């Protein structure tokens, strides 16, 4: 079997299916555009999900793709295993071909066989397949048409605890498109431990799955029943790295040509000569994930996808540190990655320099604290400690930038566990303290003695200014260098500093080649603005003349929301009453959040009227006016003021529509600039305080479009026009309630019939009828009802009834009134419950219990008679 490069495997796969009439579809971004439930694209079918659901149409019915995938966040998280196993990766590539109502099982399996044996030239005798137990069609195609010996086609049943719960039955969700699948395995030979799929030793490395063919031919209903789809589809997936390992006759994905070259590059940059070192494998894997994430717009950050990116990068940096690196190195591997993968992914090549710059900046940030953090960790583990305290893990996270899984990774190498519960407790404690201290603690601590900042942001969003002070790590400094975080104070600024509920501006402060990215603007003093951010390039000194430029898009969106808040406040008072007073607000570019005094939930009708009033003022497109006047004149003008707010002698009064309030924030020129206003949430936050959240402009349009999509999807699901949706839902609920009643009646009848059958199984022990039995399909109510019937008919008895649901066990024990002096139901049920991993309790004549070990139930029930006999 000749060797073939990863690049050639990719090309051969695409060429093969193009010749079969398929359209090449480019890899979609790692950030899914059509599935908010996914953090990252983790399979080839993600970009086709809407096609399978029938909500998207494509101009082709056959597709082929090589999809970039990531599994390092959410439930699909392989991060901790990367570097320690032969086949785990964060980033990987998935080869796939799809049929949307075109070809089906025959073509899919025959082409898979043709590609593997004739193009890739895998030995036919090394291949075997699995099919779902009921999929005779796929079984016959393998054995009768392709000619695979029957002993190498394995039927896999429902091995996951329920009907259609199988390794060989694929479901998109609990309901919807589903179907059997057929997996193709490669046999590495008897020299490798492991058994075939379906055997007790299937997790060994001898038989490796290389290709899965999913046949979506059914629609699954909520009750678990399936009906045929009108247009069956095919969805296949084959991991490129795993296939390459087979074709290149190696047993680890890290030995394939692509990884060999990345590992060699990592060795070059770190100086580590042992090419089998796990740290080199980690770095080689993580450079792919990090670079592709940046290419798709995910930058290192402190939350969400950005934090996953940071965790991946810092794990790679730490492994480089372990190999002796004390300065940025990871970014230098970007060129090697582009050389190897740039042809297949043009966006990677186009963004090569940007990717390298972003990776380098994150490296510089982490290397500033990494060495000290490692010293903290080493000190905590000196003396043979077996547990890293939670507060130490949190200090590493909070002060030195060590993600929890990074600390856990290092501890695992030393055989040490991490007190994760203590870590989360420390994190929650800090959040509580931060909420209590308020956001401005750091700013108040800055010692500034210079002049005021003249705010020019009402008129201008850019301008020239002079740096009057620089702070780094809370201390006044003369200069700021590339990569440093800090706070700049300017003599004049267009940047609005957070106050009055409006967030601070973001933007850029520059001078020549120096570029300071402003993340937030906060007040150091009442008239001094602190510009918080990071110096991306160059050097800035106190006294430098700079250009200050606000992010205009964010400012405009924030102004829309702030102006809408004033209109909403006025509408709330008009609709709910003059008692409505502002209790708090948060206005940013995405939405406005407004807390107000009101002692009842705002009804749907009231919310509609509030929306109507605000949008009516928007449509009027009236100009806004801001005036500075003395406080008494403002009060006389009828301007709304907050009772708990302290005002100076001169105040700024804003007129917008029918609203007149004191406000120092930034606002639109005309009400029409707001565009559209929509309330998206209403609820209580404290006694007598309600909260409304609303969106405006493009955010309001996006919210309405998403709502429309949801309604349309619901209508499609119920096969009803949108206008008839309410009636159809009511009908479905009525049907469900009727079915619930039928089920309850059937359970009652079943209990009665089962009770009669069980009477004959009771045994007499010293004048007491003893019965222990299982009631299939029973719930707690049925167990109790059956128990009452049996006690009535057996007269003098001790009874245990059980029901099983998966691994869980429900138990009921009953003792007739004339026997509770000899046997207690609570003692009896606990005797049985202990044997199935549970406990329970109740009255002397009736007790209930639960357990988690269904496998122990038969023996537990069999022991009841002996236990009762020993008590009599």
From Swiss-Prot:
Family: Belongs to the class-II aminoacyl-tRNA synthetase family.
Cofactor(s) essential for the protein: Zn(2+)
Domain comment, as recorded: Consists of three domains; the N-terminal catalytic domain, the editing domain and the C-terminal C-Ala domain. The editing domain removes incorrectly charged amino acids, while the C-Ala domain, along with tRNA(Ala), serves as a bridge to cooperatively bring together the editing and aminoacylation centers thus stimulating deacylation of misacylated tRNAs.
Record-listed E.C. numbers: 6.1.1.7
GO CC, alphabetical: cytosol
Cofactor note as given: Binds 1 zinc ion per subunit.
GO molecular function, one term: ATP binding
Subcellular location: Cytoplasm
One Pfam family here: tRNA_SAD
Protein name: Alanine--tRNA ligase
Major localization listed first in the record, in broad terms: cytoplasm
Catalytic reactions on record: tRNA(Ala) + L-alanine + ATP = L-alanyl-tRNA(Ala) + AMP + diphosphate
NCBIfam families noted in UniProt: alaS
Regions crossing the membrane: none
Residues that, per the record, bind Zn(2+): 562, 566, 663, 667
């Amino acid at each position: 079997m000749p060797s073939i490069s990863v690049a050639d495997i990719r090309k051969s796969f695409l060429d093969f299916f193009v010749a079969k009439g398929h359209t090449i579809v480019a890899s979609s971004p790692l950030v899914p555009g059509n599935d908010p439930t996914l953090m990252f694209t983790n399979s080839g079918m993600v970009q086709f999900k809407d096609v399978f659901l029938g909500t998207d149409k494509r101009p082709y019915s056959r597709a082929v793709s090589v999809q970039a995938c990531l599994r390092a966040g959410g439930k699909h998280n392989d991060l901790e295993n990367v570097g320690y196993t032969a086949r785990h990766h964060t980033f990987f590539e998935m080869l796939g071909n799809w049929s949307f109502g075109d070809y089906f099982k025959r073509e899919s399996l025959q082409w898979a066989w043709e590609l593997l044996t004739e193009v890739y030239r895998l030995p036919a005798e090394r291949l075997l397949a699995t099919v779902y137990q009921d999929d005779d069609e796929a079984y016959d195609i393998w054995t009768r048409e392709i000619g695979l010996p029957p002993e190498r086609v394995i039927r896999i049943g429902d091995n996951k605890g329920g009907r259609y719960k199988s390794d060989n039955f694929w479901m998109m969700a609990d309901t919807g498109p589903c179907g059997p699948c057929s997996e193709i395995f490669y046999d590495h030979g008897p020299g490798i431990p492991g058994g075939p799929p379906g055997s007790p030793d299937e997790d060994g490395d001898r038989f490796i799955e290389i290709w899965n063919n999913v046949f979506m031919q059914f629609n699954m209903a909520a009750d678990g029943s399936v009906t045929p789809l009108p247009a069956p589809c095919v969805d296949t997936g084959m991991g490129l790295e795993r296939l390459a390992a087979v074709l290149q006759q190696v047993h680890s994905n890290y030995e394939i040509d692509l990884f060999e070259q990345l590992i060699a590059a990592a060795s070059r940059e770190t100086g580590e000569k042992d090419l089998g070192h796990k740290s080199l494998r980690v770095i080689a894997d993580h450079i792919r994930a990090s670079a592709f994430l940046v290419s798709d717009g995910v930058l290192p950050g402190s939350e969400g996808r950005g934090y996953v990116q940071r965790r991946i990068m810092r794990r790679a940096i730490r492994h480089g540190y372990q190999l002796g690196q004390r300065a940025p190195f990871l970014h230098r591997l970007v060129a090697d990655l582009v050389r190897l993968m740039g042809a297949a992914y043009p966006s990677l090549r186009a963004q090569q320099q940007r990717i390298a710059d972003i990776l380098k900046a994150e490296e510089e940030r982490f290397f500033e604290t990494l060495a000290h953090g490692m010293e903290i960790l080493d000190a905590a583990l000196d003396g043979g400690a077996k547990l890293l305290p939670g507060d130490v893990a949190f200090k590493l996270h909070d002060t030195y930038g060590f993600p929890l899984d990074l600390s856990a990774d290092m501890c695992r190498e030393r055989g040490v566990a991490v007190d994760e519960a203590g870590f989360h407790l420390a994190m929650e404690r800090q959040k509580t303290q931060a909420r209590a201290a308020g956001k401005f603690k750091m700013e108040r601590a800055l010692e500034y003695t210079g002049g005021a900042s003249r705010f020019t942001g009402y008129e201008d969003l850019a301008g020239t200014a002079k740096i009057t002070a620089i702070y780094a790590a809370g201390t006044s400094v003369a200069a700021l260098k590339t990569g440093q975080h800090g706070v700049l104070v300017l003599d004049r600024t267009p940047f609005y500093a957070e106050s009055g509920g409006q967030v601070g501006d973001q933007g850029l402060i520059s001078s020549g080649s120096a570029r300071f990215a402003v993340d937030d603007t906060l007040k150091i003093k009442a008239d001094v603005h602190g510009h918080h951010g990071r110096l991306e390039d160059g050097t800035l000194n106190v006294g430098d003349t700079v250009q200050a430029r606000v992010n205009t898009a964010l400012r405009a969106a924030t102004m829309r929301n702030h102006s809408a808040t004033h209109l909403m406040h006025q509408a709330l008072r008009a609709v709910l009453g003059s008692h409505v007073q502002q209790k708090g607000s948060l206005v940013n570019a995405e939405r406005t959040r407004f807390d107000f005094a009101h002692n009842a939930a705002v009804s749907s009708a009231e919310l509609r009227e509030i929306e109507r009033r605000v949008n009516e003022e928007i449509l009027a497109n009236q100009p806004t006016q801001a005036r500075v006047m003395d406080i008494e004149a403002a009060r006389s003008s009828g301007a709304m003021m907050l009772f708990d707010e302290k005002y100076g002698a001169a105040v700024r009064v804003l007129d917008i529509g029918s609203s007149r309030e004191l406000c120092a924030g930034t606002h639109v020129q005309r009400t029409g600039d707001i565009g559209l206003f929509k309330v998206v949430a209403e609820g209580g936050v404290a006694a007598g305080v309600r909260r409304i959240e609303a969106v405006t402009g493009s955010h309001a349009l996006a919210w309405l479009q998403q709502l429309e999509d949801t309604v349309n999807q619901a209508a499609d699901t119920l096969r009803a026009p949108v206008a008839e949706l309410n009636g159809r839902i009511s009908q479905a609920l009525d049907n469900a309630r009727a079915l619930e009643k039928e089920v309850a009646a059937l359970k009652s009848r079943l209990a009665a019939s089962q009770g009669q059958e069980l009477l004959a199984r009771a045994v007499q022990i010293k004048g007491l009828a003893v019965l222990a039995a299982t009631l299939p399909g029973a719930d707690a109510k049925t167990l109790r009802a059956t128990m009452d019937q049996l006690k009535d008919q057996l007269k003098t008895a001790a009874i245990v009834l059980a029901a099983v649901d998966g691994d869980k066990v429900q138990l009921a024990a009953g003792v007739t009134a004339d026997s509770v002096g000899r046997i207690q139901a609570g003692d009896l049920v606990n005797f049985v419950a202990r044997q199935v991993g549970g406990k329970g309790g109740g009255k002397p004549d009736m007790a209930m219990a639960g357990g988690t070990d269904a496998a122990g139930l038969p023996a537990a029930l069999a022991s009841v008679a002996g236990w009762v006999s020993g008590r009599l």
